[in-house]
């Protein structure tokens, strides 16, 4: 799922990371919940895809359009500027190429700047754990594309393992 959190407002969008695309023109027909309802129910000329697979980008152009859609949706709601700052969760252990693909897609979609945070650290912060303390905390995050296991301490990840098997 794609979650958009706005400071002071909380989570303002929580929708499936699914996009319905016309196969020949590559025109995006639906994004999010509407596109998910189309999974397995489309004619041959329309395909409902997940542009993020196993926690990484599988279709850069469609991912960019999906991010752009959510930026516009949040901007129209009056929650943020048209060129927001983005913090994006990524699986631990992704390659530099995969990180760059995420960052580039967000910039092309209109982000002013992008910071990438490993998902176990984001989960620890979201759970209210004292990640800056010299105490170890184990995080197990079973997401849609990956399962992440990590130990955090002193504001960082001490060790982590990401398995590209999860709840999807």
Question: What residues fall within each predicted segment?
Answer:
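Conserved Rossmann-like nucleotide-cofactor binding loop
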Residues: 145
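Nucleotide/phosphate-binding catalytic cleft detector across ATP-hydrolyzing
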Residues: 3-142, 150-168
């Amino acid at each position: 799922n794609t979650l958009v959190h706005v400071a002071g407002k909380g989570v303002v969008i929580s929708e499936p990371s699914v996009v319905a695309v016309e196969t020949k023109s590559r025109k995006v027909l639906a994004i999010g919940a509407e596109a998910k309802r189309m999974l397995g129910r489309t004619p041959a000329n329309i395909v409902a895809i997940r542009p993020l697979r196993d926690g990484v980008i599988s279709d850069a152009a469609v991912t960019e359009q999906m991010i752009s859609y959510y930026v516009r949706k949040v901007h129209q709601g009056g929650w943020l500027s048209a060129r927001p700052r983005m913090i994006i969760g990524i699986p631990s252990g992704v390659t530099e190429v995969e990180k760059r693909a995420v960052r580039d897609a967000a910039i092309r979609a209109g982000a002013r700047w992008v910071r990438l945070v490993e998902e176990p650290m984001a989960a620890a912060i979201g759970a209210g754990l004292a990640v800056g303390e010299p105490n170890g905390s184990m995080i197990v995050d079973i997401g849609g594309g990956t399962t992440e296991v990590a130990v955090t301490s002193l504001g960082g990840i001490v060790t982590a393992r990401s398995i590209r098997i999860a709840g999807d």
